């Protein structure tokens, strides 16, 4: 279960409530929110969701500084022995920028408009799969 840090008055309590259900915990970071807002919770979550568009509207373009943000989060996780924390990226994910996002540290990509706006969603999913595996094996 992933929640937006901006929506929680006491993120620690939200994390504890989710953990009590036995579910994995994710914390979401909007483009306008500083990574410093979620740093105190990194050792308590399983996933960081990096929003690479402003939430609320599908089909938006990828915000370019998101790649640097993903790299910064990946470095922080590595430097703090928190590499178990997954980095999910949502917003503007396309076949042409997936390699950049994965190379920066994205483990899970959300590609709604690219897949479901396609005439052949199955082929787009296969292309993502092929591209992701070729990137990870290099």
Regions found by a protein language model. Give the residues of each.
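Catalytic cores of alpha/beta
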Residues: 33-45, 91-109
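Conserved, mostly hydrophobic/aromatic
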Residues: 48, 73, 90, 101, ...
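Short histidine/acidic/glycine/proline-rich micro-motifs that form metal-
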Residues: 56, 115-116
């Amino acid at each position: 279960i992933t929640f937006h840090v901006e929506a929680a008055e006491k993120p620690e309590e939200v994390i504890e409530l989710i953990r009590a259900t036995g579910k994995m915990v994710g914390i979401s970071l909007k483009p306008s929110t500083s990574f410093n807002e979620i740093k105190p919770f990194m050792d308590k979550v399983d996933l960081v969701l990096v929003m690479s568009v402003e939430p609320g509207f599908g089909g938006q373009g990828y915000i370019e500084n998101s790649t640097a943000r993903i790299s910064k989060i990946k470095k922080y996780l590595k430097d703090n022995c928190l590499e178990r924390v997954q980095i999910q990226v949502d917003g503007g994910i396309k076949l042409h920028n997936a390699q950049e996002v994965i190379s920066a540290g994205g483990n899970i990509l959300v590609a709604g408009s690219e897949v479901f706006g396609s005439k052949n969603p199955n082929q787009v999913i296969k292309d993502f799969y092929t591209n992701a595996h070729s990137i990870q094996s290099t």
